[in-house]
Amino acid sequence: MAEHPNVSIVKSMYECFNRGDLDTIRNKLFAKELVWRLPGRHPLAGAKHGAEEVIAFFNELVKSNIKVDLVRIDAWGDDTVVEVHRGYGRVGDAVLDALNCTHYRIKDGKIAEVQVYMSDQYGADNFFSAIYEYAPIPARLAKKS
């Protein structure tokens, strides 16, 4: 059975990420209206809007030495891909190694919406909080105005 084209899109994103080819991800795989949601209480958590914000987020993941390996991936219907991946990395004493699930909505052959589900949210929060500092409170409050 041939691989579903939407599965190929998500696999391509992982391959490009792991070899550091963020330009291909931005220009060929991401929709302009992309929304990427990452849960948690750490500096990288929250919704990212548009390809540029997601690529900036990916750049931070690269700095954190995170690696991702697909474990399982399947397409459902014409616009949905769900996968399980292992996310792992180490920076100093901060270590992350967890299986996560991600839901993708594909529109017009591009990734348009992503929701990540963390199997070890506490571990992810600790890992990213150990690496990245929060902006000072006045700067965070100013963003909300």
Language-model region placement:
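C-terminal and inter-domain tail/linker signature
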Residues: M1-S145
